[in-house]
């Protein structure tokens, strides 16, 4: 009887300890390693791409850098773990990366079935179609019989099938795995159409020698809320990634920028003081230093600065804010309060 009681007590203790160890795992691993590993795309202009020197840049990369700034105090301490649409979740769940900052749509099956935890939307998007002007097409409903470049392992693959079926059309699928492969097949004429998120189409078109000869058709056929993800089972790490994104949005709401963040430490706005770590203990509650959000803004800026620098109207990508404007300016970007 005593042996049975002891055995049950040991099992109960093990079950109690287990989750606590898992919860602290990723943060401790990143701090010990001194480098944050971000699962990113193989290369999408404006979002995640290596420059001439091999340094990774872009919208998603800046959010990776923001996370490193929050956790390690140094935005440069990152490693880009490249992935295709097929391999991105496998690499994250296998522990090859710490967080996924990649053009990835939040869906029920990915959240529940693939065992990912999503942390808000850093880009509101939708699926579109890119065609050559010479094709003479003005609407996606004129694409019956077209050959279409489509990336495998993506929501766009399923959306395409649904859209053509619903409109009584047929198509030839030209399957590809990377954006570069799609670009090559599209420009060579192997496919008449390239379909993916509209932001990705704008990014791809910006790399053409004759972008004016290509158009994105007016139809947007899906909702594609893109956001960061982590593995299930690590609540502390989930909280950190969630509030990294929220910090950049709140900073824009409050008018805090890379240029004025030091001055804003003397603000009379209590929420600004909490965000920048002048007051409160929010950094400690996350397991970070109290200046974690200050480090983000000082290193990469607020959400608007990240957007405009990488993909905004004054870049080759040329994307307007649209749905990604702040809620106070007609958009959907909105952060819960820092309270």
Predicted regions and their residues:
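Extended ligand-binding regions for polar small-molecule ligands
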Residues: 62-65, 69-71, 134-137, 141, ...
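Bilobed "Venus flytrap"/periplasmic-binding protein-like clamshell domains
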Residues: 37-46, 56-71, 105-106, 125-181
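Sec/Tat signal peptide C-region and signal peptidase I cleavage site
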Residues: 17-24
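Acidic, polar ligand-binding/catalytic clefts
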Residues: 65, 69, 73, 77-142, ...
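Extracytoplasmic small-molecule ligand-binding "clamshell" domains
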Residues: 24-25, 31-101, 286-291, 296-299, ...
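C-terminal functional modules
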Residues: 280-339
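Bacterial N-terminal signal peptides that target proteins for export
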Residues: 1-8
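Cleavable N-terminal signal peptides
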Residues: 10-12, 22, 30
């Amino acid at each position: 009887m005593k042996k049975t009681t002891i055995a049950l007590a040991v099992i109960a203790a093990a079950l109690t300890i287990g989750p606590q160890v898992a919860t602290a795992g990723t943060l401790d691993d990143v701090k010990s390693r001194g480098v944050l590993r971000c699962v990113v795309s193989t290369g999408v202009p404006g979002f995640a791409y290596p420059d001439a020197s091999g340094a990774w840049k872009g919208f998603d990369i800046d959010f990776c850098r923001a996370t490193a700034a929050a956790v390690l105090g140094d935005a440069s301490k990152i490693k880009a773990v490249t992935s295709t649409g097929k391999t991105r979740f496998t690499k994250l769940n296998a522990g090859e990366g710490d967080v996924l900052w990649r053009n990835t749509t939040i869906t029920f099956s990915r959240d529940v079935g693939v065992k990912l935890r999503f942390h808000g939307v850093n880009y509101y998007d939708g699926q579109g179609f890119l065609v050559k002007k010479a094709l003479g097409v003005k609407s996606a409903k004129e694409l019956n019989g077209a050959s279409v470049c489509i990336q495998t392992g993506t929501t766009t693959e399923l959306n395409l099938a649904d859209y053509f079926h619903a409109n009584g059309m047929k198509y030839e699928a030209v399957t590809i795995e990377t954006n570069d492969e799609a670009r090559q097949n599209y420009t060579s004429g192997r496919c008449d159409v390239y379909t993916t998120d509209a932001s990705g189409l704008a990014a791809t078109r910006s790399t053409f020698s004759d972008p004016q000869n290509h158009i994105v058709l007016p139809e947007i056929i899906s909702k594609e809320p893109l956001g960061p993800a982590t593995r299930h089972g690590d609540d502390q790490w989930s909280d950190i990634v969630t509030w990294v994104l929220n910090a950049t949005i709140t900073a824009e709401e409050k008018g805090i920028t890379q240029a004025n963040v030091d001055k804003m430490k003397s603000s009379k706005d209590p929420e600004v003081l909490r965000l920048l770590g002048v007051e409160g203990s929010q950094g400690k509650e996350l397991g970070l230093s109290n200046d974690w959000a200050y480090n983000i803004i000082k290193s990469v800026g607020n959400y608007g600065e990240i957007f405009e620098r990488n993909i905004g109207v004054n870049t080759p990508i040329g994307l307007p804010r649209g749905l990604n404007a702040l809620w106070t300016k007609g958009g959907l970007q909105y952060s819960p309060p820092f309270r």
